[in-house]
């Protein structure tokens, strides 16, 4: 899960 604007679990 890679979020740019909303990192809710950047793995």
From Swiss-Prot:
Tagged with keyword Cytoplasm: yes
Induction details: Polycistronic RNA up-regulated by ecdysone.
Cytoplasm keyword on record: yes
Annotated keywords: Cytoplasm, Developmental protein, Nucleus
Subcellular location: Cytoplasm; Nucleus
Cysteine pairings via disulfide bonds: none
GO biological process, one term: actin filament organization
Taxonomy, superkingdom: Eukaryota
Role, per record: One of four peptides (tal-1A, tal-2A, tal-3A and tal-AA) produced from a polycistronic gene that function redundantly in several developmental processes. Required in early stages of leg development for the intercalation of the tarsal segments during the mid-third instar stage and later for tarsal joint formation. Promotes the post-translational modification of ovo isoform B (svb) into its active form which in turn initiates trichome development and promotes tarsal joint development.
UniProt protein name: Peptide tarsal-less 3A
Species: Drosophila melanogaster (Fruit fly)
Gene this chain is encoded by: tal-3A
């Amino acid at each position: 899960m890679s979020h740019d604007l909303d990192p809710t679990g950047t793995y």
